[in-house]
Amino acid sequence: MPSKPQTTRVKRASSTRVDLLREESIRTLREMEEAIVRTRNQLKTMETVMRRARRLLDAGRPAREVAQLANAAQARAATSAIIREVQGARHRAQRAQFKLAAAEGSTMAEIARGWGVSRQLVSRMVKEPSQRRKKV
């Protein structure tokens, strides 16, 4: 009778470590939620800027004046910065989730299937050090 391929289980972490990883996961998800709120607010601001630019163009203003009058450069820079922020928050939250799942005993393959990513990505992110939060 052919044997079933064995799935390598990650060794379960201590309950203290799992608790710390759970706290980190919750914190990073909260940070991501906050970044998403800031992103939504910035996108609303950007929408207002674009609407103003469109109206200025519609009113016959020269294109070379519209960007300056609508403060497009400032809005673009702020939007780019907030998108980078939400991408970083997403990465930290995902890494925390992967580490928690691994500590709870899930395999890299199980985690990858659940998130729709490659096992290699999960493995790499689980090995990444968690960045220490800056104290303010």
Annotate each PLM feature.
Residues 107-117, 122:
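Short alpha-helical "recognition helix" segments of helix-turn-helix
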Residues 89-92, 124-136:
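Short, solvent-exposed alpha-helical "recognition" segments
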Residues 2-70:
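General nucleic-acid-binding
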Residues 90-106:
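Short, amphipathic alpha-helical "recognition" segments used to contact nucleic acids or chromatin
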Residues 73-87:
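Short, Lys/Arg-enriched N-terminal segment that forms or immediately precedes the first helix
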